[in-house]
């Protein structure tokens, strides 16, 4: 019985998150939504997943460079997260995009507009990707501390990757909707 309650609770959580995403995507500009819709129509699922995962690797590489520069590799453990991510996508390539789509799209309008203050202050929980085990991908407090130590160029590279991840997640959502029509 507990399993059924867990499933019901999980379904409720997903529905509530989806409602928040729908409301958030209404704030995204029409041109952006149209561009992403065209991407969803013209890209294969495997392309979107590949690009999302590659962009995530690029993001990890940026974070590794920053932590090396400021000599905090041991504190942040980015290489460990990168290794876990790499193993996760070997087991299930679409797990990361499946997990993050509804979380990141709740903030899509702010991310697309590059609203740095709202982006840094959004209430993102530490998210787990399930691939037989759990590990945190987003560690918000660590990220905020690291952000303060980034150069402007590093911040710009990071923001570019977050915008790309959001775009691929948005495309993936639209494509899922098109596929289920």
Q: Model-flagged regions — what are they?
A:
Residues 2-156, 170-181:
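Terminal low-complexity "docking" segments
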Residues 160-171:
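Short, hydrophobic/amphipathic alpha-helical patches that form generic packing surfaces
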């Amino acid at each position: 019985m507990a399993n059924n309650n867990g499933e019901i609770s999980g379904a409720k959580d997903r529905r509530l998150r989806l409602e928040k995403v729908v409301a958030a995507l209404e704030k995204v500009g029409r041109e952006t939504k149209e561009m992403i819709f065209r991407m969803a129509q013209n890209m294969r699922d495997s392309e979107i997943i590949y690009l999302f995962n590659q962009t995530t690797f690029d993001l990890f590489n940026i974070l590794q460079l920053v932590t090396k520069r400021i000599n905090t590799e041991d504190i942040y453990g980015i290489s460990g997260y990168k290794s876990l991510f790499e193993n996760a996508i070997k087991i299930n390539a679409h797990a990361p995009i499946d997990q993050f789509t509804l979380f990141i799209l709740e903030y899509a309008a702010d991310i697309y507009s590059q609203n740095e203050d709202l982006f840094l202050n959004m209430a993102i929980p530490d998210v787990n990707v399930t691939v037989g085990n759990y590990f945190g991908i987003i560690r918000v407090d660590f990220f905020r501390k690291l952000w303060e130590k980034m150069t402007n160029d590093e911040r710009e590279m990071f923001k570019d990757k977050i915008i790309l991840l959001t775009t691929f997640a948005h495309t993936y959502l639209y494509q899922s909707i098109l596929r289920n029509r």
